[in-house]
Amino acid sequence: FLGILQKLCREMKPDEIIIAWDGAGGSLRRKEVNSNYKEGRKPIRLNRDVRVLTKDEEMQNKVWQQYRLMEMLNFMPVIQLMADRVEADDIISYVTQSPQYSGWEKIIISSDKDFFQLCDDETVLYRPIQKKFASARHGGSCL
């Protein structure tokens, strides 16, 4: 994560970096409204074939790694946003539409296609796996 962040900062030279995290119980609010929320999604595929930890151990390890990463980011010129019962997607949507950032060029870095809907004249989506930008000017398609 830190290596990718460093590379993107070198290439994009941002004025400000905001990282959004899922808050505790982030999807609970949506699940209360729609019990089928996130049903049928494929489990996250790990980038390794050998499983040395149980699923519970992997989750604990993921939480520990995220906590350590957040601690390290506290020493960097990065703004981190997280709120209980709020998903990172909602935070990103709020920030891109916030009057505070009106007139700014905003780049969302994610492989999540749902962010296409946030693309406008000021907001583009960078899909790191494809290494391509998507923008409203091109109908949400990658450039």
Which stretches of residues belong to each language-model region?
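A short, charged helix-loop
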Residues: 131-143
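Noncatalytic, basic helical substrate-engagement surface that gates or grips nucleic-acid strands
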Residues: 1-109, 115-134
